[in-house]
């Protein structure tokens, strides 16, 4: 019962559960429209991990949108362009200079990067190649340059960057056989909101 999305309206003193699916499903990612705090997109992830077993994905995984601050949610499905069948972990990123553009890195039967141009209602697959990342249950973060909606970063064993809205990716930071001393695991990435060339790994 502790899983799901919770909301506070008093600075964190009290919390209200606004989205719940089942006891195995939690929130993997949550993004908010910077121009409208009542519009959010949630990526829910059903998974189970035991010492001897791990299962990523299930009926509870999916994308949900709200335009009323979490009072009601709409689940997006294959009718909206998302992959069919059970989904796994989903990573989300919004273009802050154009909040109608949203990217979703989706673990599915065929892992792929999806893109929405209308704020999260309709989705189109833009890339299912190896450049989008590996081990999606472990790495599923992606980031958009705040000044350039077409520059997308995926962080995983490597760090890759796309300059064309996710259609193609090139290696930005090598992982192996490199002399940069960086351990080949990238789990966080930050881009300066006013200067896309200033990033922290």
Where are these regions (language model features)?
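Beta-propeller blade termini and top-face loops
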Residues: 1-201
């Amino acid at each position: 019962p502790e899983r799901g999305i919770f909301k506070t309206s008093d600075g964190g003193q009290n919390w209200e559960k606004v989205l719940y699916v089942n006891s195995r499903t939690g929130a993997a990612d949550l993004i908010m429209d910077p121009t409208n705090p009542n519009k959010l997109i949630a990526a829910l992830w059903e998974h189970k991990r035991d010492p001897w077993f791990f299962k990523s994905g299930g009926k509870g995984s999916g994308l949900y949108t709200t335009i009323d601050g979490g009072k009601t949610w709409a689940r997006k499905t294959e009718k909206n362009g998302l992959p069919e069948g059970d989904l796994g972990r989903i990573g989300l990123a919004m273009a802050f200079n154009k909040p109608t553009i949203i990217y979703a890195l989706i673990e599915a039967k065929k892992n792929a990067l999806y893109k929405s141009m209308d704020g999260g209602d309709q989705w189109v697959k833009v890339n299912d190649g190896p450049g989008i990342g590996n081990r999606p249950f472990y790495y599923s973060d992606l980031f958009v340059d705040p000044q350039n909606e077409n520059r997308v970063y995926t962080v995983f064993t490597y760090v890759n960057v796309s300059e064309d809205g996710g259609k193609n990716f090139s290696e930005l930071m090598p992982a192996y056989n490199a002399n940069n001393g960086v351990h080949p695991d990238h789990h966080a990435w930050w881009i300066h909101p006013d200067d896309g060339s200033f990033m922290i790994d």
